[in-house]
Amino acid sequence: MSAKDVRFSGDARDRMLRGVDILANAVKVTLGPKGRNVVIEKSFGAPRITKDGVTVAKEIELDDRFENMGAQMVREVASKTNDTAGDGTTTATVLAQAIVREGAKAVAAGMNPMDLKRGIDIAAAAVVKDIGKRAKPVASSAEVAQVGTISSNGDTAIGKMIAQAMQKVGNEGVITVEENKSLETDVDIVEGMRFDRGYLSPYFVTNAEKMTAELDGAYILLHEKKLSGLQAILPLLEAVVKSGKPLLIVAEDIEGEALATLVVNRLRGGLKVAAVKAPGFGDRRKAMLEDIAILTGGQLISDDLGIKLENVTVDMLGRAKKVVIDKENTTIVNGAGKKKDIEARVGQIKAQIEETTSDYDREKLQERLAKLAGGVAVIRVGGATEIEVKEKKDRVEDALNATRAAVQEGIVPGGGTALLRAKKAVGRIANDNPDVQAGINIVLKALEAPIRQIAENAGVEGSIVVGKVLENKTETFGFDAQKEEYVDMVAKGIIDPAKVVRTALQDAASVAGLLVTTEAMVAELPKEEPAPAMPGGGGMGGMGF
């Protein structure tokens, strides 16, 4: 076991505070509409330019191990806020720095750290309650666009695009962000259910120009196992041919002979057919096939249900108004499933999302939910250079997370106004213990930090802005840093999701409380590298030995 370096009390807190300041100072310059960019060196390729707080925080590692511990604890604030709310990481970092700074001063003045933490927690709970009271539900698509615009640093085009996507796919729908090959940024809405499996043979193509197989009013056969021969389903195929409708076969795999027979029938024109592999793997594949069965009003042909392939009749098949299959994806539009059954399935998936502890499982369940409940929208981000595209993609992802948070818990006045107004709620708290009261006062002062930083990044004196906003008793009155004027924030569309503001404060108070109560720090001593050995002499030439 290697030797350790141990620091105590004031020495430990001072070095930790230096680390907190280095990280927070790098992150907080990005806050607000006039926040600056941070350029990050990459080990390969061009440097990355970003205004995303958590991206900056994740890149910072300090040489001094004690300073680095302080920095990493604040980085944890940004990461936690990002995981929970998807935005507000810079606000959380600014709040954490403000609470830690004041807390360290109070401890140095001889106050009890545990009582200080108790006070910080009491005040944080009061702010959370106050934000919950102030939050107003998102009533219109215009408000969704406003939230998106604010979170993407005033880019109205991004705000409108996200609002358009959310309107189309609903709040449960999946919206993904991809890089575009062109200069344009656009939205592609996929209606119906899409899964990432394409046709098994190009001979199934019906539209040679687009290289897609399009089946109108199709029957859909869903089979859990491999199809190695068609003997068992010949009566079914004959019934489908008589109906004159096309058929989509979805199975684990369709092997050589069966596939060749389908292709020959397709080319001869007797049977309009296409075949694709089932999406997913293992248990997830079965669940996705059941989703498709419920969406199309069909039945999954599975041994578990005791249904043999030879006993399948036409009324067991799913139906859809249209199926479009390309080389990589299959899209089922307007399935004939009963609304009641689909809603029950959606409820079941939501319950699984609540219960799961795995982030990966949660993500996959949410994708399934979206495909059943809403649809899928893809925002393709374009730009002149790769650096620009990456920077814009960061902002689009932030804006998307913020709008989702706004839909969940409502909106509050933006620009740090909601936190500043929460001072009134914290100011009402009185505690007999002076150290607990000092903890409450630390949060009271820290609530000014975000609006001060937004103002200072815009080149305006923060104290003057705080004073003017507090002078006016209108709850929604605040400072528009973009135009450097005092306005009604909600009327101007400068709004923040309540969830983002709440999470930022909770996470900042939680980690800052731990930092304040730190009394000792333990780090590994840096290892001394041994000096490299002398290279071999190898004799001197020309000496004649």
UniProtKB/Swiss-Prot annotation:
PANTHER family assigned: 60 KDA HEAT SHOCK PROTEIN, MITOCHONDRIAL
Binding of ATP, residues: T30, L31, G32, P33, K51, D87, G88, T89, T90, T91, G415, D496
NCBIfam families listed in its UniProt record: GroEL, PRK00013.1, PRK12849.1, PRK12850.1, PRK12851.1
Reactions listed under catalytic activity: ATP + H2O + a folded polypeptide = ADP + phosphate + an unfolded polypeptide
Subcellular location: Cytoplasm
This protein's GO CC annotations: cytoplasm
Domain of life where this protein originates: Bacteria
GO MF entries: ATP binding; ATP-dependent protein folding chaperone; isomerase activity; unfolded protein binding
EC number: 5.6.1.7
One Pfam family recorded for the sequence: Cpn60_TCP1
UniProt-recorded name of the protein: Chaperonin GroEL 3
Record's function text: Together with its co-chaperonin GroES, plays an essential role in assisting protein folding. The GroEL-GroES system forms a nano-cage that allows encapsulation of the non-native substrate proteins and provides a physical environment optimized to promote and accelerate protein folding.
GO annotation terms (biological process): protein refolding
Key words, A-Z: ATP-binding, Chaperone, Cytoplasm, Isomerase, Nucleotide-binding
Family, similarity comment: Belongs to the chaperonin (HSP60) family.
Subunit note: Forms a cylinder of 14 subunits composed of two heptameric rings stacked back-to-back. Interacts with the co-chaperonin GroES.
